[in-house]
């Protein structure tokens, strides 16, 4: 499929922080994470609010912006999506976020299906360089010009991982790109 340009050639990149998440969790907690594919709220919050981790994501994109092209970031939770998108915009990178319909008492942000559709259209039209999302762009959305995905949320689900990676793998014969970055 790659040779026929139906799929993009994947280029995998990994970046690391010195942060550890879940060191204090016992075996039962780790088994629960694997079974439910859901992080405990404390770990999700720690990841979402990590200034060093979020800065690394934005700086990595900024350094390779020409190579990465249009990018989807898979965030840990709503707060993470809002923070990452704000950091991208502060760095001069046009970004927005999409999440499920919410009215968040903590952040005061209301997002509707119409808001998400408007943001998706802006991304499709090239008005946004980065689209940050929480559990929305894993399936059923056609964004063929996506060249890079940042997997900023963990998963143990091979199905979810395949769906996230697949957002960038549409090849030129299918209206996409010749190569795709999985970060």
Where are these regions (language model features)?
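Conserved C-terminal RecA-like helicase domain
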Residues: 40-133
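Intrinsically disordered, low-complexity boundary segments flanking structured domains
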Residues: 1-4, 82-85, 167-173
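Conserved RecA-like P-loop NTPase helicase motor core
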Residues: 94-183
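Compositionally biased, intrinsically disordered low-complexity regions
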Residues: 24, 28, 71, 107-110, ...
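Interdomain helical connector at the RecA1-RecA2 junction of SF1/SF2 helicase-like NTPases
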Residues: 1-69
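Short acidic, gly/pro-rich beta-turn/loop elements at beta-sheet edges
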Residues: 22, 83, 159
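Intrinsic disorder/low-structure terminal segments
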Residues: 11-15, 87, 140
